[in-house]
Every structure is written in structure tokens, then in C-alpha cells.
Amino acid sequence: MRLLSDQKFETIHAFEVVDDDKMVSWLRTAVTKPGAPGYDTNRYFLWCTFSVLAPYRRRGIGRSHLPVLLELMDRDGCHTLTLESEEEPGHAFLGWLGAAKKSEGAENRLHIPEVDWAMIRRWIDEGEKGSPETKLEVYDDHIPDALLEEFAPQFSALLNTMPWDDLDHGEIVATPEVLRHEYERMDLAGLKHHTVLTREPNGVISGMTDITWAPHRPKILSQLFTGVRPDARGRGIGKWLKAYMLDRMHRLYPDAEWISTGNADSNGPMLAINKRMGFKRHRWGAEYQISRDKLAERVEALV
């Protein structure tokens, strides 16, 4: 079964393997659409994720997805396939495939009832005192539309400071149109979006963090992105942002018990902040990449 979701800036394909009306495997792919922001540097990358139910593994279902992936890569002119796994069978499959492990990371979770609130308040005070001319801005909704022209390029710059490890990748380009589309999707899902950022006297956004809360899982807050400009690091801005956001979310969502966030294992500064706050590893994973030609060799060997 094949499902197609034609998003505004990406082409999404979803495939399902069904046994007696029961979905036993799924495959999802994404590729940047021609004309989308960042297309020139992202056009050659196809991203995918798939899974097979445990009782149906080792029957060739995972291998059956490979010709589909090759067909999609050829159709869109992609030369690199990016995959991921959070389970040992998945890592073993990707090793068999010949994909190279390029980045490792984890979902880390903070149990809010165990937070050291005295430390959190101290970090907030230290942030204010350490950067007295830096303004903290709080948005308990999306960034206002009137600010997107100014916000989008600075947000893009922050996003592109994320550690990529050995992953081949394009440039992240967040335009006002891209952000509006993302906000529309959040609204359709019923998400509540919150952003805290720091702005320097010259108007430059030196750091930011944002979080979503979902009514269908009210106990868990999802921290999406936290970043500080390289030229603003060493001033405690990351701790200030994380502490302020945590304190605010605890007040707005007193019944929430967890904050979940994802971090690359190589992101030492952010992991150090998270560890002091009480974040603990919940689920480990890795990203892999394989070239189109190497995938084709594996597909030919299956015939």
C-alpha cells in the first residue's frame, strides 16, 4: 500500500505492508521539493525511516523496501540516503545493508518533580546579572508574523550551528513562509508552542529555545531546539534560557511530569547543561547514510 503526502516544501511518501488488514511494516521517506528554500544544497538527500513488527522480522520485509528506496532516489536524482535506528535489530540491518554510521544521539528526559528548583532560580539570576544588556523575550505562542522577516534568517543561522558529526547534509533555510507552514501544522495537531530567546543590544538574537505541549500527551513537554550563537557562548546564556523555560513551563503546565529533548552525543556543552538539570538518557539512536550506487549494488544482489 502506498500513501502520498505532498507537503508544501517536501514530498513525503509512506508505504505500508499489510497482513490480513494488519499493518506489519511501514516506510516513510522525505525529499526537498524543487523550488523550496534550501533546495540547491538538499536536493540530493533522501531521508527515510521504516520499521517491521517483531513477529514479522527475518522474513525479507525490510529487504523488500530497498528497491522502493532506490526507485525514489533515481526519480528525484538523490545520491545519498539517510536512515536511522533506535533498536539493535535496526542497527544490525543497516550494518548488513552497508550503510555507514554517521551520527549518534539520544532522546533525553527530565523528570520535573526531581528538579533542583533552587539551582534553576540561581541560573536565571546569574543569566540576568551576567548579561545585563541582553533582553529576554518570551512568546507563549508562535513568533508573531510581523517579526518573521527579521527572525527567520537569525533562526536559520542558529539551526546551522547544530553538530552534524559525519553526516553529509545541506543547509537549513528557515524562511517566513517555511515557519508559517510549520506553525500551521502545529496548530492542526493542537500543539501549544512556546519560545524564549535572548536579544543583544544590536538586535542580534544570541540564543533561543522552544517547546511544545500536546493535549494528547499532557504529561510530556517536547523541547525542540536550543542554541546559542558561537560568539555569545561562555556567558551562561544556554543555562539562562533552559532554566527560564523550565520554570515557565512548570507554571503553565503544572501537571506535566517530563521534558523530552534530543541531543547529539557530540554536543558536549548542551549535554553538560542537561546533565546538571537532571536530564537522563531515555533512548539511544544513530543515523546512517549510504550512497545510491552502494544501495543499487545491494538491491542487485537480492535478485
Question: What residues fall within each predicted segment?
Answer:
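Conserved acetyl-CoA-binding loop-helix of GNAT-fold acetyltransferases
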Residues: 52, 58-74, 92, 96, ...
